[in-house]
A protein has these predicted regions:
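Extracellular carbohydrate-recognition regions
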Residues: 25-47, 197-202
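Extracellular ligand-binding interfaces
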Residues: 70-151, 176-182
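Serine-esterase "nucleophile elbow" of acetyl-processing enzymes
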Residues: 198-263, 276-285
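Extracellular carbohydrate recognition
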Residues: 159, 173-189
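Alpha-helical cap/lid subdomain in secreted, periplasmic
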Residues: 114-117, 240-259, 268, 272-404
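Bacterial N-terminal signal peptides
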Residues: 10-21
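Extracellular beta-strand elements of beta-rich domains used
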Residues: 95, 136, 165, 170, ...
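Short carbohydrate-recognition loop motifs
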Residues: 53-75
Length: 404
């Protein structure tokens, strides 16, 4: 080889090494290299047998850990990490995942070192059977219950307080099919861009979806909610307000093509459903997302100041994940006959958020307090919490009035 070619080769080697060194320098520190198994599988309480397995396999970088669940089993593989204060200096974290090609989702769960009530979820799709990188800003590490504040290194929950790193799927995902996935290299990320341009809509309220309905264009409505909305709840078998809403819209707009998607899950709270959005909302490309929560949240300790904070975050998350496509309609918290005015502060918070974030608003609380002034029990089923036919009709009418 001539001296000039040798110089070119060595120059290429040196340049490549410099590029690699630069890339490595820009990478954040590892949280877990996943070259060893440090998680323990969940155990069935009755049989005391593990609900799944975790094993080493070939990874994206060296080895990785494969997590497998048996059919009809949920829960989490438990594991621990010891973060340092410098976690708070990073924008979030990333990990590599290889799915099983199914439509199900896996989840990372980060839990506070001293209080299990402060636990946070990060869902991920298992659709890809090739390695892909998932990047998560701290703001998208979402508290599962009201005890946890939103993650914010400035004035919220600080990532350096996490101690547990669990892998699995949530109990409230309802379905527990067999699934498996591989995880490799979980590491901190110095910079993660968060798109905020969709958080402030060009057209406020629900004007866009109303125009589509008037024009007879296809419209998809997703109704996020708890047992007051869930089609699977026993109280909603005879009638449910989302179906009555669609019937009312079709009468008002005879040419409208309306698809209804109802991912509501009884017993859940707003934050849990925000975690599940990538599975239950985003794939449907909704034109309208209705948000109906409050009773379970209040039971969990949610009060106005925190409710306002979570609702604002929820509206932004819906707009971000739907890339501004979806109009958002907030429903004020529906009273219960046994809790008639106790949750008014949550409804006050919803009104404030709707005005500030320029969403639509269906004031369900005001409608119920007015209609039930003389005989509120008629709006409910036997437990005086869940809705009877008249209650469902009133919610549907209130939402319909908001879509004018």
């Amino acid at each position: 080889m001539s001296p000039s070619k040798q110089c070119l080769v060595w120059g290429y080697v040196i340049l490549s090494a410099a590029v690699c060194a630069l890339v490595m320098a820009e990478e954040g520190p590892l949280i877990a290299d996943m070259d060893t198994v440090f998680h323990k599988p969940p155990v069935d309480e009755k049989t005391r047998q593990p609900k799944g397995t975790c094993e080493l396999v070939e990874g994206r970088f060296g080895k990785a850990v494969k997590f497998s669940f048996t059919t009809d089993s949920g829960g989490f593989f438990t594991g621990w990490r010891n973060p340092t204060a410098n976690w708070d200096e990073y924008a979030g974290f990333s990990f590599w995942v290889k799915g099983d090609g199914s439509k199900t989702f896996g989840c990372l769960e980060l839990i506070d070192g001293e209080d299990y009530g402060k636990r946070y979820g990060v869902p991920f799709s298992l659709a890809d059977t090739e390695w892909r990188k998932v990047t998560v800003p701290w703001c998208d590490v979402i508290p599962e219950i009201p005890k946890g504040d939103l993650v914010d290194v400035r004035d919220g929950y600080k990532p350096s307080a996490f101690r547990n790193l669990w892998v699995g799927k949530f109990y409230y995902w309802r379905h527990y099919p067999q699934q498996s996935f591989c995880i490799d290299e979980i590491r901190l990320e110095k910079s993660i861009p968060v798109e905020t341009k969709y958080c402030t809509p060009e057209v406020p309220g629900v004007a866009r979806v109303v125009e589509k309905l008037k024009a007879g264009r296809p419209v998809t409505i997703v109704t996020m909610g708890d047992s007051l909305t869930d089609f699977n709840h026993w109280a909603n078998k005879p009638v449910a307000w989302p179906k009555l809403l669609v019937e009312g819209l079709k009468k008002r707009y005879p040419n409208a093509e309306i698809a209804l998607v109802n991912p509501a899950i009884g017993g859940t709270q707003l934050s849990q459903n925000l975690i599940l959005m990538e599975q239950n909302v985003v794939p449907h490309k909704p034109d309208l997302v209705t948000v109906c929560f409050g009773y379970n949240d209040y039971d969990g300790g949610m009060r106005k100041a925190q409710w306002v904070k979570f609702l604002r975050f929820g509206v932004d998350r819906i707009r971000r994940l739907t890339e501004g496509r979806a109009d958002v309609l907030l429903l004020t918290t529906c009273p219960a006959a046994t809790r008639w005015e106790e949750m008014k502060e949550l409804s006050e918070g919803a009104r404030e958020v709707a005005a500030g974030k320029k969403t639509g608003l269906a004031d369900v609380e005001a409608a119920f307090l007015k209609a039930g002034a003389g005989n509120k029990e008629r709006l409910y089923c036997s437990d005086k919490v869940h809705l009877g036919p008249e209650g469902h009709a009133l919610v549907a009418e209130t939402v319909l009035d908001a879509l004018k």
